[in-house]
């Protein structure tokens, strides 16, 4: 499985997930209204949202773009 780890105007960076991590995730952490910080990567289980986080998990290559 290949997941996106970062995304910018220059393109995307990906990583091949290690054995046992068969999910990609994208976490959006809301800093202030209309401004958020995104974290992407591989995971064994879908992370639990905290505070004002929004989390998307998926199981196909680069699905967390």
Swiss-Prot record:
Keyword check for Zinc: no
S-S bonds: 3-24, 17-42, 46-57, 58-63
Superkingdom: Eukaryota
Impact after mutating residue 5 to K: In AncTx1; 2-4-fold increase in inhibition potency on ADRA1A and ADRA1D adrenergic receptors and 17-20-fold decrease in inhibition potency on ADRA1B and ADRA2C adrenergic receptors
Impact when changing residue 49 to A: In AncTx1; 2-4-fold increase in inhibition potency on ADRA1A and ADRA1D adrenergic receptors and 17-20-fold decrease in inhibition potency on ADRA1B and ADRA2C adrenergic receptors
InterPro entries: Snake_3FTx, Snake_toxin-like_sf, Snake_toxin_con_site, Toxin_cobra-type
Expressing tissues: Expressed by the venom gland.
Effect the entry attributes to changing residue 28 to W: In AncTx1; 2-4-fold increase in inhibition potency on ADRA1A and ADRA1D adrenergic receptors and 17-20-fold decrease in inhibition potency on ADRA1B and ADRA2C adrenergic receptors
A single Gene Ontology CC term: extracellular region
Effect of residue 52 to R: In AncTx1; 2-4-fold increase in inhibition potency on ADRA1A and ADRA1D adrenergic receptors and 17-20-fold decrease in inhibition potency on ADRA1B and ADRA2C adrenergic receptors
Outcome recorded upon mutating residue 12 to V: In AncTx1; 2-4-fold increase in inhibition potency on ADRA1A and ADRA1D adrenergic receptors and 17-20-fold decrease in inhibition potency on ADRA1B and ADRA2C adrenergic receptors
Keywords: Disulfide bond, G-protein coupled receptor impairing toxin, Pharmaceutical, Secreted, Toxin
Any one GO molecular function term: toxin activity
One family name in Pfam for this protein: Toxin_cobra-type
Misc. comment: Negative results: does not show interaction with adrenergic receptors (ADRA2A, ADRA2B, ADRA2C, ADRB1, ADRB2), dopaminergic receptors (DRD1, DRD2, DRD3, DRD4, DRD5), histaminic receptors (HRH1, HRH3, HRH4), muscarinic receptors (CHRM1, CHRM2, CHRM3, CHRM4, CHRM5), and serotoninergic receptors (HTR1A, HTR2A, HTR2B, HTR2C, HTR5A, HTR6, HTR7). The analog AncTx1-W28R-I38S (which is not modified at position 28 and 38) shows a 10-, 740- and 5-fold increase in inhibition potency than the analog AncTx1 on alpha-1A, alpha-1D and alpha-2C adrenergic receptors, respectively, but is 2-fold less potent on alpha-1B adrenergic receptor.
Function: Orthosteric antagonist of the alpha-1A adrenergic receptor (ADRA1A) with an affinity of 0.35 nM. Also has affinity for ADRA1B > ADRA2C > ADRA1D. Acts as a relaxant of smooth muscle. Reduces prostatic muscle tone as efficiently as tamsulosin (an antagonist presently used), but with fewer cardiovascular side effects.
Protein's UniProt name: Toxin AdTx1
Taxonomy of the source species: Eukaryota, Metazoa, Chordata, Craniata, Vertebrata
């Amino acid at each position: 499985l290949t997941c996106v780890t970062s995304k910018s105007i220059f393109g995307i960076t990906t990583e091949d997930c290690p054995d046992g991590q068969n999910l990609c995730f994208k976490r959006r952490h809301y800093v202030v209204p209309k401004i958020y910080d995104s974290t992407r990567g591989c995971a064994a289980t879908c992370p639990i949202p905290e505070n004002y986080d929004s989390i998307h998990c998926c199981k196909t290559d680069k699905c967390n773009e």
